[in-house]
Swiss-Prot record:
Organism: Arabidopsis thaliana (Mouse-ear cress)
Protein name as annotated: Protein PHLOEM PROTEIN 2-LIKE A9
InterPro entries cross-referenced by the UniProt entry: PP2-like (IPR025886)
Coiled coil: none
Gene responsible for this protein: PP2A9
Spans annotated as Disordered: 1-21
Sequence ranges of Basic and acidic residues compositional bias: 9-21
Highest taxon of source: Eukaryota
Residue ranges crossing the lipid bilayer per the database entry: none
GO molecular function: carbohydrate binding
Length: 180
């Protein structure tokens, strides 16, 4: 039986604790990328601390999970991104983040307007930025205090799947989860 390579990249590492930032960090190899298994669309680095590079997609879906959460606590979720100077397709792209607790949890969505609003500045070679930024407001999710014996894995993602437009040049440096 032959093994067939997937068109998608499945996370292959766990989140690491960053005590300085009081956060848990996922490098690109620890995230799931739709179309990430195909080098025509994404370059997923094998080396730590290197960003994943979007070559081109019309369906952006990058997801991760975190299982070290505690009932009754609130968690802040975000991504650190930048753009290549020749990036395209982001000026009118409605980028969203989502989060939910457990497979059956209610999904919470947040539009990340700062990506399209600041695209011209971001693709000018600036340093990586956290999204959502202050203009978007923080993205936080509360784990129910009664969730003790339930599935409490935090699942989160970054999406732009609605326009069908091609997007290029996004660099994803990391995803992070911070206890508030």
């Amino acid at each position: 039986m032959s093994s067939q390579k997937s068109s998608h990249h499945k996370a292959d590492s766990k989140m690491e604790q960053d005590n300085n930032r009081k956060a848990w960090i996922s490098q690109p190899s620890g995230l799931n990328f739709v179309w990430g298994g195909d080098s025509r669309y994404w370059v997923i680095p094998k080396e730590p601390r290197m960003p994943a590079e979007l070559k081109m997609v019309s369906w952006l879906e990058v997801t991760g999970s975190f299982d070290k959460i505690e009932p009754g606590k609130t968690y802040r979720i975000g991504f650190k991104i930048s753009f290549k100077p020749d990036a395209t397709g982001w000026d009118k792209a409605p980028v969203f983040m989502s989060a939910k607790i457990g497979k059956k949890g209610k999904t919470v969505w947040k539009r990340i307007k700062s990506v399209s609003q600041n695209f011209g500045i971001l693709k000018g070679g600036s340093e990586p930025v956290n999204i959502p930024d202050e203009s978007d407001g923080l993205f936080e999710i509360l784990v129910s205090p009664t969730a003790l014996n339930q599935d409490t894995k935090l699942q989160f993602g970054l999406y732009e799947v609605w326009t069908g437009r091609w997007k290029t040049g996004l660099l994803i440096h990391e995803a992070f989860v911070q206890e508030v």
